Design a protein with these regions (language model features):
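Short acidic-hydrophobic, aromatic-tinged amphipathic segments that line or gate anion-handling sites
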Residues: 72-77, 252-256, 319-327
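Catalytic binding pocket for nucleotide-activated donors in carbohydrate/polymer assembly enzymes
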Residues: 132, 160, 274-355
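A nucleotide-sugar donor-handling region in carbohydrate enzymes
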Residues: 2-9, 131-205, 229-232, 329, ...
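Catalytic donor nucleotide-activated moiety binding site of glycosyltransferases and closely related
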Residues: 55-67, 218-254
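Donor nucleotide-activated moiety binding/catalytic core segment of transferases
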Residues: 78-84, 237-279
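C-terminal alpha-helical cap of glycosyltransferases
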Residues: 360-384
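Active-site and donor-binding regions of nucleotide-sugar-utilizing enzymes
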Residues: 25-176
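Active-site donor-nucleotide binding/catalytic segment of nucleotide-sugar enzymes
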Residues: 12-13, 18-34, 117, 122-125, ...
Length: 384
């Protein structure tokens, strides 16, 4: 049945969608990635008259049932590689790395590929070597990514990529939601700690999950555990073990979905390892992070060739405190230190955000302007 739905999508996008309405195509692997596009989509709809297409590989993606006349939604999964190879549009927007490095290839047609980041991490340690080689434009989050990509181009003679000083729309959405919370400065409610690690090997949940939750609950902290979606998919036993251990504890909550940011907004402190959520949480809620000192999340063994310290590494001592796993028995002291010095950390976080994030509050407009400029240039070329 799913495959039939894919064939119908292919037919609809090729033969039933006017060329002007497939000039721009967004692609998403999973429904959760819509949160990285929504600001850009809203800004684009206000400046681009024609509808555009949104392709998802998640059959349960709510966008497939959208009634928005400005978006044509399609489902492609197994047939996606074929679609990608022959897609004919002006601009293709995606948050998936490694285009043209594996089974998803650039189109045989002259398509301009725009990359949108789904994390604020640096480009050279958490991503594979060459992950951004085959995009025409990259909407950079901050100056650190521009420096890294420029340095990478110098070392390897990568093709000419437009590095757009855009910003990070998801961060702005988190900050806007947090700013509207009436309880954001309420000290009377129980302290809440969010544990949200990465899914890499040696992550916090795998090594110290039950021990960490038990130590926090014994100190009367409310605890929310938010496993990475890849952890739920690859290591479901970790979540199951936590649920079984603390199911009778009303102060424990296991959050299996990342559809909302509610847990981030309600947490007084975030505990993580090398996950990109640390930057989103700190810069979005202006609250500190407690980092667990576990091995780095390295997907590119050559990252040191750039001689640039990854942003997520340089920020660890600035956005909070780094704690060794052997110090879990002192977890309450670390959390209380962060909470008691919240204003000092807030001032520092706001300063660092202004120094390291482009166009805070206006990134979606910048991204939409870039796409519209590409469409304008393409139209001029076609008319000549």
């Amino acid at each position: 049945m799913a495959l039939i739905k894919e064939f119908v999508s292919l037919w609809r996008i090729r033969f039933r969608t006017p060329k002007s309405e497939r000039a721009v195509i967004f692609y998403s692997e999973h429904e959760s990635y819509f949160s990285y596009f929504d600001g850009l989509i809203d800004a684009l709809k206000s400046t681009h008259a024609d509808p555009f297409c949104y392709v998802t590989s998640d059959i349960n993606d709510p966008i497939l049932t959208t009634e928005d006349p400005g978006i044509h939604a399609f489902y492609l999964h197994k047939l996606l590689p074929i679609f990608m190879q022959f897609v004919n549009c002006r601009v293709f927007v995606m948050t998936l790395t490694d285009l043209n490095n594996f089974h998803l290839r650039r189109s045989i047609n002259p398509v301009h590929y725009v990359y949108v980041f789904h994390a604020m991490n640096s480009t050279h340690m958490a991503y594979r070597h060459g992950a951004f080689d085959h995009y025409d434009s990259i909407l950079c989050t901050g100056p650190y990514q521009v420096r890294e990509l420029q340095r990478d181009s110098e070392l390897r003679t990568v093709g000419n990529r437009q590095l757009v000083e855009a910003g990070y729309s998801r961060l702005e959405r988190i900050h806007a939601a947090w700013s509207e919370r009436p309880d954001k400065n309420d000290d009377s409610t129980p302290r809440t700690v969010l544990i949200a690690p990465s899914w890499a090997a040696s992550n916090v949940l795998e090594k110290h999950g039950i021990e960490l939750v038990a130590a926090l609950r014994s100190a009367d902290f409310e605890v929310i555990v938010r496993p990475h979606p890849e952890t739920n998919k690859r290591y479901p036993e970790l979540s199951t073990g936590l649920q079984e251990a603390f199911s009778a504890d009303a102060g424990f909550q296991l959050e299996r979905s990342v559809r909302t940011d509610d847990s981030m907004l309600s947490a007084d402190v975030l505990i993580t390892d090398w996950s990109g959520i640390a930057l989103e949480y700190a810069f979005g809620t202006e609250r500190p992070v407690l980092y667990m000192d576990v091995p780095r999340k390295v997907h590119n063994d050559r990252y040191e060739e750039l001689h640039i310290e990854p942003f997520e590494a340089s920020m660890r001592g600035e956005l909070g405190i780094v704690m060794a796993p052997e110090q879990i028995d002192r977890i309450a002291d670390f959390v209380n230190e962060l909470v008691n010095n919240r204003q000092r950390f807030r001032d520092q976080i706001v300063r660092l955000r202004s120094e390291n994030v482009f166009n805070f509050g206006h990134s979606s407009e910048i991204g939409a302007q870039h796409i519209c400029k590409l469409l304008s240039c393409d139209t001029q070329l076609q008319s000549n």
